[in-house]
Amino acid sequence: MSSVYKTKNLQGHERPIKQLKFSSNGKYIFSASADRKVIKWDYKNNTKDFIYQHQASVNVICISNSDRYMFSGDSTGCIYVWDIDSNENIKKIQFEKLYNITSLNISSDDIYLIVTCSERGQKSNNFIAIYLVEDIIKKTPKEETKEKPANLLQIPSMMNQSIKSEPAPEIYKKIECSERNTKFIKSCFTNMNKSILISRQDGFLEMYDFTNDKLIFSGKFHNDEILDFDVNYENGIIISSSKDGEMCVINLNSFQLINRFKPTNPVRLLNSCRIGIIDNPYYLIPGTKRGISIDTLFDLNTLDLNKLVFFENEKDREKAKKFKNKRQIILAIVAGGQDSKFVTTTEQKEGGFEIIIYNVFSGEKLAEFLDHFGPINTLAIHDNVLASGGEDSSVKVHDINHYLFDK
């Protein structure tokens, strides 16, 4: 069950990584950083494909499901729109006021862009703005710019090109936070774009009916700010991670709590979480042979895995028992660490900088590994490939199969 690689290290940023995203086809990883850059990585070949330049720290990015457009938001409230194939900057949108953009997401049909933002210094002016993507990407005439020489790395980039900003298009729909002493942190579409899932600063998760403009559900799952969440529609689950050091697994339909994890003690910030669906290489298919035909000897629904003789060695037999003959394994992956302002005097093992992988439903810890020298700020996953970005400015690419099956 050996994997091709354990971990790849992608070096190209000078400041902390803020967010990572895979392209829908899994070909590229996009990394947004406080160094004002987004890098498009051809990670399979360990190369930079393109560098996109902002004029401030890039905090959030999202990729259209068609893999045609990238949207990136920075600390000055600017949203840049990029054509991924040509790497052309289509538009730079500047809000009228100085907004802090905390999340960018796109609907599964690529029709709506959902932006979570708050006005700097204003507790009450916090809202979610939903735009029509066709209004966002609409091209406008540009002034001609002289071609500049390539940067020293000889990587194509937008570094030296000046981009004229434009006012934001008309908001299609706006959701304002009704509670005065909290803020929206993140939002995304769910349920075939009929609903919007929202996380709040006070530990609440909310579901908003996008079609009928009403709140469906509001419930408190954490004792502090929810820093991240992820949704898996096929299995009907949400996972959320928080400043309170806990990760919750929640039923998407009933909003009942399924599991609660507290990975570290003392409490560390859980900055990012992702759901992973991994094929089980130890799954025994009815009618196939691993030494003998199993379907004639066992009812697979009540298979006694302690009596297995189909695997070559004891290690494989133990793995087969561990994963209980499930065709797929559903994972909850979480990472974070000690607050970055305290990190300079912290030992790597004491900071809670590990990536931890759990079985969503059983709650069993399946793997734990340490690969960053500081807090992990963001996770992204595509199939069995997990990417992590840290305060140490590095992007790591991990083969999950190695940590689950090769150890």
Q: Residues of each region from the PLM?
A:
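Hydrophobic beta-strand positions that form the internal "hydrophobic ladder"
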Residues: 29, 70, 113, 196, ...
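Conserved strand-to-loop turn within each blade of WD40 beta-propeller repeats
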Residues: 32-35, 73-76, 116-124, 199-202, ...
